């Protein structure tokens, strides 16, 4: 909506590098669902699984510049569980940072944050000025996994640069990940987009709605009602009659009436307690 409101282009990218989590037909279902709800993207769909050479080239540049090191630490060795989402990774203590033998046998590659790295700062469209001491608050992070797969942060940075992305709007749960991506952009000589991290919808206890028992699937039969509800949650104050209007009519109202300033400074919106939907 932000891109359309500003007269820009909206791009669709399918993050399908992790083949174990990509069920057959899932990408097609994603696209079909977006269409049913009136989302229209510009250009061709970008599949990360088709762009591996770009990622390998970027990784080689980081390795040759000396900004990475091998890490053979297992999750059990570090007493951590595997993170299932970007932004939830634990802080790595630097165990293999000065261990040349780590490159012997299977190993991951980590981006080495400089010891004198200053705070990474940027102005977020919704959260205002954000700063992070990446070395202490994030730690050296994986750019290539132990199984050879390119990690999320590196793939995202490479794609944003290759596609000319100049604005990224996403959830506030990824706010703490952004400084790491900025470090990679600087290492690769890539531009940094404008970022905006929207508030999350959460349960009264703080859990993300998408991960809770009250989350309901998208239903094309009630697409208008669900779109209207999301706009209301996002403080856009859509006219009540739009809840029964065609999907296109909702978008025709929403795009010119987008008011991002109503969301400034908010990390989450806790929904009222109530029974789980039937």
Predicted regions and their residues:
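N-terminal Rossmann-like or analogous alpha/beta NTP/dinucleotide-binding catalytic cores
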Residues: 1-85, 172-173, 177-190, 242-249
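Noncatalytic linker/hinge segments flanking ATPase motor cores
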Residues: 49-56, 111, 198-199, 235-245, ...
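Residues that form generic nucleotide/phosphate-binding pockets
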Residues: 58, 81, 95, 99, ...
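A short, terminal or domain-edge coil/loop segment
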Residues: 62-75, 127-131, 135, 245-266
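Active-site cores that bind ATP or allylic diphosphates and position pyrophosphate for catalysis
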Residues: 75-220, 238, 271-278
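Conserved catalytic-core subdomain
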Residues: 207-278
